[in-house]
From Swiss-Prot:
Belongs to the ATP-dependent DNA ligase family. Keywords: ATP-binding, Cell cycle, Cell division, DNA damage, DNA recombination, DNA repair, DNA replication, Ligase, Magnesium, Metal-binding, Nucleotide-binding. It catalyses: ATP + (deoxyribonucleotide)n-3'-hydroxyl + 5'-phospho-(deoxyribonucleotide)m = (deoxyribonucleotide)n+m + AMP + diphosphate. This is DNA ligase. Its cofactor is Mg(2+). The active site is at 258 (n6-amp-lysine intermediate). It comes from Ignicoccus hospitalis (strain KIN4/I / DSM 18386 / JCM 14125). GO terms for molecular function: ATP binding; DNA binding; DNA ligase (ATP) activity; metal ion binding. DNA ligase that seals nicks in double-stranded DNA during DNA replication, DNA recombination and DNA repair. Signal peptide: none annotated. GO terms for biological process: cell division; DNA biosynthetic process; DNA recombination; DNA repair; lagging strand elongation.
Length: 594
């Protein structure tokens, strides 16, 4: 397939923010792929996602930094590196630099007698970039740069622009998974729900695309969990009233301790190998060799996928330690030392698959029973503490028991016949009830950083505040909620430039909906936990714009930073719909007669 066909689609995607147009452009591109070579549909999907393969594969990245790209452009365009650097300062986009310089590259002399070069194919671009990624060892940096330069020489100026942006990790398309799923549904002749279900059970959108176009919609319906391939996790809603929680769940529920740890999906493969995925579907197996051993000893099955929480514990008392301790352990290079300093326990709460049986369509009581059968419990590897509750008093009492033992609160789960495992979905089958929700402040929310403001005075030289947004599921975009500048320690403020640097954008990212213009735009990637005084109507912020009141969105008053949430991706952030529910819930309480 001609790479120019893909590039034409990328260019059109870059020019629009309309969800309808994005889906139409993707649909036409996928139809073209099916006509030309349907076997590459998975790779085209990955390319649009800005990657060569899903992150959880654990394969190497392309591994060429900014300086290396500058050198590759200079080699390809036959100009000095200083000229590339100067133009980069002027344009702020290495892709545009490559496009301009390749358009001016010398074509006279001997080149006049050379046969016109063949059009570059997508297959060649992908395979070359893949080859670059796997170049390792001594001399690999120079080889990577020369290989990239060779690819740029074969490309048209416009193609060079997108190759460079891809290598730099800055495609700037504004395309989310939801838009790709909708387009795949169109070309496969099925519904969005069918594609989404398959993706939720097998978190590899390229692989799902290949099933859709090579095997058809019926094959998509047969997709089930597969050990070694992460399942997109089920998510919980939130409420702060025991009566409302039980009402939502149909009168009773299974209340489980909510642990302050790292959610983990533990896969036992038929060959006895254990793989661990984080909530963000990252392969974190190397960080937890102790958990690997717990699973090998404690899972009595040939193959299984179970879910639980990895919690840091005090080695002397066995009491839980904060989530930050776990993240500190993850950052340590000496894993053996980290294991001794910060030991962990695993609290299991669900089973997704076991010995050929898909458990996601089974109600919770059956899944819990099967989990009990499969797990041989030990002090380090056991089921979550849980209790069946049917009255607000029972729920409240169990909540305080959880708090007194050093945990966050409860997750209360439906136990009726339809209490299935909704992979990748947030719904009212699971409801969080945390201690933070008992305060007079608004519930803490997880928001995505989309901009930053320079600090003044004591904060000079770094950023003093962040623009944060909720996830707008309807538009597959990020809508602003507030500007947060308090709650940061001096150390956290000092780290902000380094933390934000990989995500800084010269222009507003396509998926960001904002009336506020920060000093620096930030591509949606980092998630922060924020708390505030209340949720109010706002003529400035765009979260839930026009949904509650015409012309107004919702904002958080007096927001305060609590902590970073490295375990969450941008689409895992609190949704604008959830913020609307929080606003209405608070409003209802204010309006209730005393």
């Amino acid at each position: 397939m001609k790479f120019s066909d893909v590039v034409d689609a990328l260019e059109r995607l870059e020019r629009t923010t309309s969800r309808t147009q994005i889906v139409a452009i993707l649909t036409n591109l996928f139809k073209k792929v099916i006509e030309e070579n349907k076997d590459i549909i998975d790779k085209v999907v990955y390319f649009i996602q800005g990657k060569l393969w899903p992150d959880w594969y654990g394969y190497p990245e392309i591994g060429i930094g900014e300086k290396g790209i500058i050198k590759a452009i200079s080699l390809a365009a036959n100009v000095k590196e200083k000229e590339v650097e100067g133009l980069y300062k002027q344009l702020g986009d290495l892709g545009l630099v490559a496009e301009r310089l390749m358009a001016k590259a010398p074509k006279g002399g001997l080149m006049m007698f050379v046969k016109k070069k063949e059009e570059l194919t997508f297959e060649k671009v992908y395979e070359t970039l893949k080859r670059i990624a796997f170049m390792q060892g001594e001399g690999s940096r120079d080889l990577k740069i020369k290989t990239l330069a060779g690819l740029l020489k074969e490309a048209s100026p416009k193609e060079a622009k997108y190759i460079v942006r891809f290598v730099q990790g800055k495609l700037r398309l504004g395309v989310g998974d939801a838009s790709i799923i909708e387009a795949l549904a169109h070309v496969a002749g099925t519904t969005k729900d069918v594609v989404e279900r398959a993706y939720n059970l097998r978190a590899d959108l390229g692989a799902v695309a290949k099933i859709a176009v090579t095997e058809g919609p019926e094959a998509l319906k047969r997709v089930r969990p597969k050990p070694g391939v992460p399942v997109r996790p089920m998510l919980a809603e939130r409420l702060n009233d025991p009566k409302e929680i039980l009402k939502k769940l149909g009168g009773k529920g299974l209340a489980e301790y909510k642990y302050d740890g790292e959610r983990a999906q533990i896969h036992l493969l038929p060959d006895g190998k254990v793989v661990i995925f984080s909530r963000r579907l990252e392969n974190i197996t190397r960080s937890y060799p102790d958990v690997v051993q717990y699973a090998k000893s404690g899972l009595k099955a040939k193959e299984a996928i179970v879910e639980g929480e990895i919690i840091a514990v005090n080695p002397e008392t066995g009491e839980p330690r904060p989530f930050q301790e776990l993240m500190r352990r993850r950052r340590k290079h000496d894993v053996a030392l980290a294991m001794s300093e910060i030991p962990v326990n695993v609290k299991l709460f669900d089973i997704i698959y076991v010995d050929g049986e898909d458990m996601t369509n089974k109600p919770l009581p059956l899944r819990r029973k099967r989990l009990e059968e499969v797990v041989e419990e030990s002090e380090e590897f056991s089921l979550s503490t849980a209790k069946l509750v049917s009255t607000p008093e029972e729920l409240e009492q169990f909540f305080h028991q959880s708090i007194s033992e050093g945990h966050e609160g409860l997750v209360v789960k439906a136990v009726h016949d339809k209490s299935v495992y909704q992979a990748g979905a947030r719904g009212w089958l699971w409801i969080k009830y945390k201690k933070d929700y008992k305060s007079e402040m608004v519930e803490p929310v997880d928001l995505v950083v989309v901009g930053a403001f320079y600090g003044r005075g004591r904060r000079g030289g770094t950023f003093g505040a962040l623009l944060v947004a909720g996830y707008d599921e309807k538009r597959d975009a990020f809508a602003t909620v507030c500007k947060v500048g308090s709650g940061f320690s001096d150390e956290e403020l000092a780290r902000l430039p380094e933390l934000l640097k990989p995500y800084i954008s010269e222009t507003k990212p396509p998926r960001v909906i904002s009336n506020v213009k920060p000093d620096v735009w930030v591509r949606p990637a980092l998630v922060a936990e924020i708390i505030g005084a209340e949720i109010t109507l706002s003529p400035i912020h765009t979260c839930a714009k026009d949904e509650v009141s015409a012309g107004s969105g919702l904002a958080i008053r007096f927001p305060r930073f609590i902590r970073w949430r490295p375990d969450k991706g941008p689409e895992d952030a609190t949704t604008c719909g959830e913020i609307v529910e929080m606003y209405k819930s608070r409003l209802k309480k204010v309006e209730e007669p005393t």
